[in-house]
Amino acid sequence: MKKSTLIQSIIIALLLVATVSVYTQNMSLKKKVEKFEASTKTREGNLKRFDTLDFIGWSGKNIKVFDDIHASDVHVEGTMSANDLAKHSNDAQSYFKFLKEGDGVVSHPVKLADGDWTAVIGETRSTVPDTAAGAAIGATTKKKGFMLTLAKWSDGKIKEEYVFSLNGDANNSFLNKYIK
């Protein structure tokens, strides 16, 4: 074989190897981008569902929306703890009786999502009368409060929920033991 033919063969082989390598890297990068986009879509969807939960389900006292967003075996810790949707839903309906028109979550100044988790701070407006004090939420004459909700999602539903509330009366707040 001539020296020039050998050099041409080596160059062609190197070009083929380089082409395959670039193609493989592009496919790997494409898969990473697709995975990132899917993850972003999931995170954004969970945050949107959480907005729906707070603004329509909770503040709008819409128990159907409230129930649809929680898993049937939801585990809840915080102001109203529960180990299933039936109890969580009943607790919510009991609390709804004390919410006046315009009470509830009025904004989400902070919303974060990572993987299957969301962390949302909700600004609340409500006046809970003394007659509701037995509901573990504490009575308050304050109009403004905050809630931090950490939620773990599975298939578009909340599977675990951890609610920390500061309703204007720090002495009655579940959140109080974490603020020092």
What spans do the regions from the language model cover?
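Short, low-complexity N-terminal intrinsically disordered segments enriched in polar/charged residues
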Residues: 22-68, 72, 179-180
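Low-complexity, intrinsically disordered terminal/linker segments enriched in charged
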Residues: 30-32, 159-180
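A mature extracytoplasmic/lumenal domain signature
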Residues: 80, 123-126, 165
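Hydrophobic/aromatic beta-strand elements that line small-molecule binding cavities or substrate pockets
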Residues: 92, 106-112, 146-152, 162-163
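Single-pass membrane-anchoring alpha-helices
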Residues: 2-29
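Exposed beta-sheet edge and beta->alpha loop/turn motif
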Residues: 122-155
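A solvent-exposed, acidic/Ser-Thr-rich amphipathic alpha-helical stretch
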Residues: 44, 63-117, 139
